[in-house]
Each structure stands twice: as structure tokens, then as C-alpha cells.
Amino acid sequence: MPRLLHPALPLLLGATLTFRALRRALCRLPLPVHVRADPLRTWRWHNLLVSFAHSIVSGIWALLCVWQTPDMLVEIETAWSLSGYLLVCFSAGYFIHDTVDIVASGQTRASWEYLVHHVMAMGAFFSGIFWSSFVGGGVLTLLVEVSNIFLTIRMMMKISNAQDHLLYRVNKYVNLVMYFLFRLAPQAYLTHFFLRYVNQRTLGTFLLGILLMLDVMIIIYFSRLLRSDFCPEHVPKKQHKDKFLTE
């Protein structure tokens, strides 16, 4: 009798429901004064809390996977470990949850960049989940979550109007370093690796297309980060006021 369900589907469902339950639990926490008075900021705050939790867990998990299976740094297509596979399923579940959360909360227009990113990320992760290829690439991609820890702290402090706090000023420099080490560097390394699939009709070619689009998004985000934190006089005060990604 043919198997009707892929064994990864329960893992994806379980991860998605875990993040849903986590969001409900985090919604019980007290809110900063500047957040609780604004429904949009309240939603952003809760959304970022879940993102923060995901970044901490998956960022540390990705580092452990690379440490346990260093072949993932070289054999990006074929290297595999159970821990790495579960990590990719875990993060795919987060992206499914966050996509549903954004759409269900009516933030699709304000958060369209996040939705595009999530769709591309899920497309890449599903190749590792359902075809057991490029699991190593998925783990290396998730090193970005180490950078996201500090990026999320930055966004949460901006939402709560704490830009003048010492922690914000320290974090903006740490965030810049982490952006280079765990976002730009891994992305450049992966792009260089996947360029070998140019002119081929393979799964690697599909993933190269996703990587190139993510490259563009990462460069745009980096320019926004520099402009907002280091050249604030060049940021129009009312520009993108309602965007989920605060600059």
C-alpha cells in the first residue's frame, strides 16, 4: 500500500503548532508602555517575541549542527544529520506560522517583504525536507538567525521608543558585526557554491535562483540598517511609517 503522508509532515505540523502555542503564551506577558497603547505595535511586539525565540533556538542549533557535522561546510548538497534535518523542519514550521500570523492579522500589505522572504525560505527548506538534499545548505542558511537575535532586539527597542537607551547604542554596533559574520558572509559563501549550478536544470538551479533573490533583499536591508542607525538624518520621518520592518 503506497504511503500517503510524508513522514516530515507531522514534524512540520508539530513545529507550526508549537510556535502558535508559544505566541499565545507570550501574549500573556506585560507590554511596554509605548506598545500597549497602539494595537499595531502590540501585534508587532508579540510577533517579534516569537521571532526572537525562534532566532535564539535555531541560531544556536545551527552552530551546534555545523560543529557536530563540519562536512556541512563543504558538502552542502549531500551532508546530512538528523539534528540538521530536524532544525530545517523546525524553522520551516516557524515560517509557516509567521506567514499565517501576518495574513490573519491583516498585515499583508505592510509586511509583504516578509511574506516574499518566507515563501522563498520555505521553498528552499522543502527541498531538504522532502528530497533530503541540501540539508547542509539549509543549516548554513540558518546561521543568519544568530544575526537576527540582535536585529530583533533592535526592532523591539525601536517599537518601544528606547532608541536613546545605552543598550540600543551598544546593540547597533554588535548588530552590524553580526550582520557581516552571520548574514552577509554565509550568504556570499552559499551563492558562490550554488553558482556551479548555472545552466543546469536541477534542484540546485532552483535554489540558486532563490539565493540570488535573497541576496538582493539582504543588500537592501543592509542599506536600510546603515541609513537608519548611522545616517538617520537621511531617513524621511514619515517614510514607511506602517511597515512591519521598522528601519
From Swiss-Prot:
Species for this entry: Homo sapiens (Human)
Keywords: Cell membrane, Membrane, Signal, Transmembrane, Transmembrane helix
Residues in the bilayer without spanning it: 124-144
Domain of life: Eukaryota
Transmembrane segments: 47-67, 84-104, 174-194, 202-222
GO cellular component, one term: plasma membrane
Parts of the chain on the Cytoplasmic side: 68-83, 195-201
InterPro entries attached to this UniProt entry: TLC-dom (IPR006634), TLCD (IPR050846)
Subcellular location per the Swiss-Prot or TrEMBL entry: Cell membrane
Topological region Extracellular: 36-46, 105-123, 145-173, 223-247
This protein's name: TLC domain-containing protein 1
Gene behind this protein: TLCD1
Function: Regulates the composition and fluidity of the plasma membrane. Inhibits the incorporation of membrane-fluidizing phospholipids containing omega-3 long-chain polyunsaturated fatty acids (LCPUFA) and thereby promotes membrane rigidity. Does not appear to have any effect on LCPUFA synthesis.
Family matches, as Pfam families: TRAM_LAG1_CLN8
Residues of the signal peptide: 1-35
Residues in TLC domain copies: 40-234
Keyword Membrane among record annotations: yes
Alphabetical GO biological process terms: membrane assembly; phospholipid homeostasis; plasma membrane organization; regulation of membrane lipid distribution
Membrane association type: Multi-pass membrane protein
